[in-house]
């Protein structure tokens, strides 16, 4: 009776272990499904930012090509800039949250952890690439706007150096150079453009500063992932090498097997021939007797 009780207890423990294993597997699958859902959402956000950056470039060109840009064009650019910042913040927060969870699970080396690291790294690099393009577009727009201001100042008879122009932009007061402009129709139009371009640059610089910390955050994250990516690449290369070696060994084995089969057939034929000759000799001997 006591032995039977022990058997039942052992069976129950085994069933409990099996149930726990199933629950862990289900939980892990659900976790990875949620992870891939976040990955897809983040990827779509980055793609949308990329689209917005291309739209912003077009609006920059329109604004630069017109002496006095339409207010609607500037409003559209403002809305686009706000949307880019909103989505970029969302992506940054998602990536940092993923990074935190990966660091917490670092002690457990598993296949899904490597997958999460790889996916996170790919998205981080893609995000930095898109934001770098946006930053380059902003800097280009600033330089070209500054060039337009410089040309308009020359039209009014005021020549300025790059250093003087930067001083005006940093002060936030275009009156430093526009206060003594001659009152004429040409000068008024030039003055209007100077003030408009100056406001564009001030707004732009505010946007660049807001995005700077975010950009550096993710750029540092990607830099830290460099070694990890190199290790992943090395592991992949080693895996490919092993596959190639295994394939070569398989070819050799097939070749040797084929050669062995041929030798076996030859031996069998020789044995059959020898047996035939032996049978013939025995037959002749019996006949003679």
Curated annotation (Swiss-Prot):
Cytoplasmic side: 1-263
Pfam families: SNARE, Syntaxin
Residue intervals of the t-SNARE coiled-coil homology domain: 191-253
Disulfide bonds: none
Side Extracellular, residues: 285-289
Keywords per UniProt: Cell membrane, Coiled coil, Disease variant, Membrane, Neurotransmitter transport, Nucleus, Transmembrane, Transmembrane helix, Transport
Gene Ontology BP term (one): positive regulation of chemotaxis
TM stretches of this protein: 264-284
Coiled coil: 32-111
Any GO molecular function: SNAP receptor activity
GO cellular component annotations of the record: apical plasma membrane; azurophil granule; cell-cell junction; dendrite; endomembrane system; extracellular exosome; glutamatergic synapse; growth cone
Cited SMART domains: SynN (SM00503), t_SNARE (SM00397)
Gene3D superfamilies associated with the record: 1.20.5.110, 1.20.58.70
Membrane recorded as keyword: yes
Function: Potentially involved in docking of synaptic vesicles at presynaptic active zones. Apical receptor involved in membrane fusion of apical vesicles.
Family recorded in the similarity comment: Belongs to the syntaxin family.
Disease: Retinal dystrophy and microvillus inclusion disease: An autosomal recessive disease characterized by early-onset, severe retinal dystrophy associated with intractable congenital diarrhea. Intestinal biopsies show loss of microvilli, microvillus inclusions, and accumulation of subapical vesicles in villus enterocytes. Diarrhea 12, with microvillus atrophy: An autosomal recessive congenital enteropathy characterized by intractable secretory diarrhea, resulting in severe dehydration and metabolic acidosis. DIAR12 can be diagnosed based on variable loss of brush-border microvilli, microvillus inclusions, and accumulation of subapical vesicles in villus enterocytes.
Subunit structure: Interacts with REEP6. Interacts with PRPH2 in rod and cone photoreceptors. Interacts with ROM1. Interacts with SNAP25. Interacts with VAMP2.
The protein's name in its UniProt record: Syntaxin-3
